[in-house]
Swiss-Prot record:
This is Histone promoter control protein 2. GO terms for biological process: chromatin organization; G1/S transition of mitotic cell cycle; negative regulation of chromatin organization; nucleosome assembly; regulation of transcription by RNA polymerase II; transcription elongation by RNA polymerase II. Residues 1-164, 295-437 are annotated as: Disordered. The keyword Phosphoprotein applies. Present with 238 molecules/cell in log phase SD medium. Pfam families: HUN. Keywords: Chromatin regulator, Chromosome, Nucleus, Phosphoprotein, Repressor, Transcription, Transcription regulation. Component of the HIR complex, which functions as a histone chaperone that cooperates with ASF1 to promote replication-independent chromatin assembly. The HIR complex is also required for the periodic repression of three of the four histone gene loci during cell cycle as well as for autogenous regulation of the HTA1-HTB1 locus by H2A and H2B. DNA-binding by the HIR complex may repress transcription by inhibiting nucleosome remodeling by the SWI/SNF complex. The HIR complex may also be required for transcriptional silencing of centromeric, telomeric and mating-type loci in the absence of CAF-1. It comes from the Eukaryota. Residues 29-39, 113-135, 155-164, 363-381, 404-415 have a biased composition (Polar residues).
Length: 625
């Protein structure tokens, strides 16, 4: 018999469905879906099937045997659903979505996710859209197929009944046998007898499509209640190094080797069960937080009880039952709640009674949880694990109760000691009363006289004592205080005034004599102010009384006005240190002299001019011949 492709048609339109037929049909007049090695689909009629077979016979089909388990592990990084392969519903007019596997649906809408030889080649190469070559399709069929695709295509990541009942059957391997040149597509009924032999389908391929793996088995409602609460097992194929399929003794001799993923596998995750367990855990943590807020004083007992809760949770995790976890966490939460103790005699009795009640409550809750689990159909080994975990919980509770008793005793003793101190607090000294400020108080109180009060005129007054030649005010605070508050201040003021008046008169006489000498000789001679001051000081003692009587009240100019003050000190300046003036005068009076000069003191042919005591110049004197 000629080898020809088999058509798998799952459309719900008026066409015949191939699952009702028990034999593989070879249709020469109808169209066939042919998957080329380049992942492109070509439309060919039944009359050209022989040419198609010749093309496939010329191609080299010797390909490397893929390691499907490794490639499925790669796909786990990309797929986020409950299955490592996407849910794909293929019809006569639908296009396959991107993915390595192709699947079909039965009339009940349950995806079979059947992997055949063509899907393995698609798994190795880039995906390409599947096209139909049926020319006799009418517009009604296409419209019905579109409606069916829109209804049956589930969204990626959605948890539905199809996702829960999804079962990945074993993937076919590409054999290196050159006799099987054509691509075989298994029918939905999954017969393995005569058609497999006629179409050169290997026995390994035929064994995969048994009644257990067919669509009819998925259409049946789940008999056991386990399918409703637990997700279906993910079955993964395995291969040996030589390409043969390994067999699992648990599945039988006729079935190929299948690996059943363990419950700890990341593929077999139930979204609803995990959400329920998380909700229960959040409730238990909220109850613990409420207990902590009610009794914040006993922190040590709370920490130990929380550690016991975590230990009990770790022991119970082997059974993986959320009901038992809830019961144990509630019992531990009830153990956390403290009971206040009043006296030392009632502490021990109250602690013993509370411990007994806690143990009874915990034992009752755990036994009730075990009874519920046994009624639900739990096994004997889970009950044994629960009993072992109960013994460990009791041991931890005993240790916790011992530690709690010691901590409660310490806290109660500390409270008893602190009570008398709280009843009789120390009396604080009353704060001094401060009268509120009033407006009338400022007027009633008499202002005290200041210790020092100095008047410094900043403007031109009768006396220009503080004015500089530039009009700036200069004063010395210490001298002002001495002048005003010194016991002999009046006498000192009179002496100062007399000195100043004498200096003013002397300056006037000297200015008049200088003008006369200018007219006579035409020479400008500058007077030494220091010598004048020394001579005047000697004359003040004898003429103090007469000078004061002859002073005129008229304003006079500054005594140093009109003199060349470059390089000279202002004697009247209060800020100038007089000690420096005295030092210069002493240096000039010594024999060594202050200035370094080499040469005759008087030039040849000149006379040294001498100055009299009254300030007049004397002609003649020593002549240097």
């Amino acid at each position: 018999m000629d080898q020809k492709a088999i058509v798998l048609d799952n459309s719900k339109s008026g066409s015949k469905q191939t699952k009702s037929s028990g034999k593989m049909q070879t249709q020469t007049d109808t169209n066939a879906e042919v998957l080329n090695t380049d992942n492109s689909i070509k439309k060919e009629t039944g009359s050209d099937s022989e040419d198609l077979f010749n093309k496939f016979s010329n191609k080299k089909t010797n390909r490397k045997i893929p390691n499907i388990a490794e490639e499925l592990a790669k796909n786990r990084n990309y797929v986020k659903g409950a299955s490592p392969s996407p849910i794909i519903i293929s019809g006569s007019s639908s296009t396959s979505p991107s993915g390595p596997s192709s699947s079909s649906t039965n009339p009940m809408g349950i995806p079979t996710n059947r992997f055949n030889k063509n899907t393995v080649e698609l798994y190795q190469h880039s995906p390409s859209p599947v096209m139909t070559t049926n020319k006799t399709d009418t517009e009604e069929k296409r419209q019905n197929n579109r409606n069916m695709d829109n209804k049956n295509t589930p969204e990626r990541g959605s948890s539905s009944f199809a996702a829960k009942q999804l079962k990945i059957s074993s993937l076919l391997t590409i054999s290196s046998n050159e006799d099987s040149k054509t691509l075989h597509i298994n029918d939905t009924n999954g017969n393995k007898n005569s058609n497999a032999a006629s179409n050169n389908i290997p026995s390994a391929y035929a064994e995969l499509h048994t009644e257990g793996n067919s669509i009819e088995s998925l259409i049946k409602p789940p008999s056991s209640p386990r399918n409703k609460s637990l997700t279906p097992k993910v079955i993964l194929p395995t291969q040996n190094m030589d390409g043969t399929i390994a067999k699992d003794p648990h599945l039988g001799d006729n079935t190929p080797g299948i690996l059943i993923a363990k419950t700890s596998s990341p593929v077999n995750l139930d979204v609803e069960s995990t959400a329920q367990s998380l909700g229960k855990f959040n409730k238990s943590t909220n109850s613990l937080k409420a207990a902590l807020t009610k009794a914040p004083a006993e922190k040590v007992s709370l920490k130990r009880s929380i550690s016991s809760v975590t230990n009990s949770d770790s022991n119970i995790s082997s059974s993986k039952k959320p009901t038992s976890e809830k019961a144990k966490k509630s019992s531990s939460a009830s153990a956390i709640l403290p009971k206040p103790t009043t006296t030392k005699t009632s502490k021990k009795a109250a602690s013993n009674s509370s411990d007994s009640t806690r143990k009874k409550n915990a034992s009752n809750k755990t036994t009730s949880a075990i009874k519920k689990e046994s009624n639900a159909g739990s096994k004997l080994n889970t009950v044994k694990k629960e009993n072992s975990s109960l013994s460990s919980i009791k041991a931890t509770e005993k240790e916790k109760d011992k530690g709690g008793n010691s901590t409660e005793a310490k806290n109660s003793t500390s409270n008893v000691r602190k009570e008398p101190t709280a009843k009789s607090p120390k009396r604080l000294v009353a704060a001094p009363t401060v009268s509120p400020p009033k407006i009338l108080q400022t007027a009633e109180t008499k202002a005290k006289e200041p210790s020092i009060l100095i008047d410094v005129p900043l403007y031109q007054a009768d006396t220009n004592d503080y004015l500089d030649e530039n009009g700036q005010v200069i004063f010395n605070l210490s001298t002002l205080i001495k002048e005003k508050y010194h016991p002999k201040s009046k006498e000192l003021a009179q002496l100062k005034d007399s000195k100043r008046n004498l200096l003013m008169q002397l300056s006037d006489h000297s200015n008049g004599s200088l003008e006369k000498e200018k007219d006579e000789e035409g020479d400008v001679i500058e007077l030494d102010d220091d010598e004048d001051m020394e001579e005047d000081e000697g004359e003040i003692d004898t003429e103090t009384n007469t000078v004061t009587t002859t002073i005129s009240p008229k304003k006079k100019s500054h005594p140093m006005k009109g003199k060349n003050l470059i390089g000279k000190y202002d004697v009247e300046d209060p800020f100038i240190d007089d000690s420096e003036l005295l030092w210069e005068e002493q240096r000039a009076a010594t024999k060594d002299g202050f200035f370094v000069y080499f040469g005759p003191l008087i030039e040849k042919g000149h006379y040294a001019s001498l100055e009299r005591a009254n300030g007049t110049m004397k002609r003649g004197g020593v002549k240097n011949k």
